[in-house]
Amino acid sequence: METLRADEISNIIRERIEQYNREVNIVNTGTVLQVGDGIARIHGLDEVMAGELVEFDEGTIGIALNLESNNVGVVLMGDGLMIQEGSSVKATGRIAQIPVSEAYLGRVINALAKPIDGRGEISASESRLIESPAPGIISRRSVYEPLQTGLIAIDSMIPIGRGQRELIIGDRQTGKTAVATDTILNQKGQNVICVYVAIGQKASSVAQVVTTFQEQGAMEYTIVVAETADSPATLQYLAPYTGAALAEYFMYREQHTSIIYDDPSKQAQAYRQMSLLLRRPPGREAYPGDVFYLHSRLLERAAKLNSSLGEGSMTALPIVETQSGDVSAYIPTNVISITDGQIFLSSDLFNAGIRPAINVGISVSRVGSAAQIKAMKQVAGKLKLELAQFAELEAFAQFASDLDKATQNQLARGQRLRELLKQSQSAPLAVEEQIVTIYTGANGYLDPLETGQVKKFLVQLRTYLKTNKPQFQEIISSTKIFTKDAEAILKEVIPEQIELFLLQEQT
């Protein structure tokens, strides 16, 4: 039998003592007092920060929003069905952040940047805070490049620039989402990254939008962030900030981005729900006092960066739904005051068959012609005024029986101008095609045609120019000016095509 040697034992003990690493792990913990309706009240968590992420025993993550003297109010990022009274909670020391990378392009994700399209995980090496400060005054420059939407009514009269914030507002079922999705479709080949944020929408509506993008080949430069109507209020509240963080990632990498929020009024409702459950005092329409700040800090992140930061841009297009045309409600007035203009969609126009149903009279872009190419300014300068005069005259003509010839001519011209602004959904037009269309109407070439023939003729004219006179498109795209040569081509082609069209219609 072997005897134990004392020196060996002492050596082993000495080695073990040397290897001992004294690590003290301090964790800030608390206990659940109450849980329900997506809100948990926690006792403890004395050193938690406002907006800090906390983790519950069973894995649910929450955000500490209310820091009170005797408890902490936490909103849950999940259903929290497994959280029990008395279970422990620990502070993570982190503020809400998401991974970001080029790999997100073409994917559908949720507010936590997790994929929900069933196409596997998304690899990312960097991360960004969901809430980051907006660029300062010195970091920006004024908006000067156009963001073409492909819709004649917008690009000619209510132009949107890269880095602008333009509100799309109107009643339900007036084509607001269609205007936004057409804008995304028109960015194909324009080197613009698009982010579409669906907040509190029907899952079927989001699926329809994604299908449209896939069919038109727009998903390759688009990210869809979706939190549908059945998502927890916390995630609906976070979704727009997640979209903004992804768009910012590309903006600071010297790229142009466009982000659509559909729609911030649903985000405000989710925030109202959270605030009321946290027992914050309600204000107008029961919204909390800081609901303006909710939207202003989101929309202020849209910017056109200066040359030292790489001239990237982020254009925001929030969509707000009104109730029976009431733009004086709380959320619409808030968002109107934050944005640089609004596109107003009218249900009366929509029902009258004028689509997109844009009310040109009360829609405005506060950036104006700075966001247009020179060619468009030259051709469309008087279009808005002519349409406004026509609308006034049309209202007057309803009561007058006998009108003089000049008034009749002006009414006929106005009807044809209104007709050329009509467009089918998912059929955006290139800026060269828009210039041809507006020039044809504004210079009276459409006057011999019946109103019902206008659309058919314009399609024919644009096709003819594209195939037989490609030099017109080259002049506009290279110089961005409506030159005498470009006008000469149109003066030669349009009368010929009108004659040919009228002959075809007679036979």
Swiss-Prot record:
E.C. numbers: 7.1.2.2
Report the enzyme's class at the first EC level: translocase
The cellular location(s) given in this protein's UniProt record come to: Plastid, Chloroplast thylakoid membrane
Give the catalytic activity. ATP + H2O + 4 H(+)(in) = ADP + phosphate + 5 H(+)(out)
Q: State whether keyword RNA-binding applies.
A: no
Any GO CC annotation of this UniProt entry: proton-transporting ATP synthase complex
Mode of membrane association: Peripheral membrane protein
**PANTHER family recorded for this chain?**
ATP SYNTHASE SUBUNIT ALPHA, MITOCHONDRIAL (PTHR48082:SF2)
Q: Which NCBIfam families does the record match to this protein?
A: atpA, PRK13343.1
Q: What is this protein called?
A: ATP synthase subunit alpha, chloroplastic
The scientific name of the source species is Piper cenocladum
High-level lineage: Eukaryota, Viridiplantae, Streptophyta, Embryophyta, Tracheophyta
